[in-house]
Amino acid sequence: MSAATIRYFAGAAEAAGTDEEVLEGTTVGEVLAAAQQAHGDRLSEVLERCSVLHAGRYVDDDTTVITPGATIDVLPPFAGG
């Protein structure tokens, strides 16, 4: 199992109660599940609308294997223009 730094932005940071933490998992899905378990339903609801980046690249598959020491960014939709 690897550890990854997960960074939350905007509404995701508010729902998690932090803007960064280190969580363990083998895949992006496992890390996000650990985050949901740690922070509850509010974060789970926000994650449904978020984009997720692993090592700076968009992830659309929760089975993506994380690289040791990787960063996972959780980005809610942004409004404005």
Predicted regions and their residues:
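Ubiquitin-like/PB1-type beta-grasp interaction modules and other compact soluble beta-rich domains
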Residues: 1-80
